[in-house]
């Protein structure tokens, strides 16, 4: 995976930070790690930082990723406001009732929403 994963032990969420060259494949790999970690720890919230990743992949891969975002989990995504890839994935996920939201401002706002969102 092109990026880093850390745990916020106090607030109990995973933080994913993707590098500029990351693709949808890296997202899928991170998702598998998150699902495994969630099963082991019960953590079901993630802060995902894709601000340095303007492009992620072909539309079909983006659609499949958005479609396959797990239910019963919450994802706050720090994004670049000019990334159509990120907006597309959010739209696909929201249309399927997933708890995902893009944030273009401060990380604090994203974390606040992440912690307030019901699971």
Please identify what each model-predicted range represents.
Residues 1-119:
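Amphipathic, Lys/Arg-enriched alpha-helical "gate/interface" segment within cytosolic domains
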């Amino acid at each position: 995976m092109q990026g880093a994963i850390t745990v916020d032990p106090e607030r109990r969420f995973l933080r994913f930070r993707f590098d500029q060259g990351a693709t949808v494949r890296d997202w899928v790999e991170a998702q598998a790690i998150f699902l495994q970690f969630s099963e082991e720890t019960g953590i079901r919230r993630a802060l995902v930082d894709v601000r340095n990743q303007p492009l992620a992949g072909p539309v079909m891969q983006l659609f499949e990723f958005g479609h396959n975002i797990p239910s019963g989990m919450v994802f706050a995504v720090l994004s670049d406001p000019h990334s159509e890839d990120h907006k597309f994935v959010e739209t696909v996920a929201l249309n399927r009732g997933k708890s995902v939201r893009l944030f273009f401002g401060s990380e604090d706002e994203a974390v606040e929403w992440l912690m307030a969102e019901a699971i």
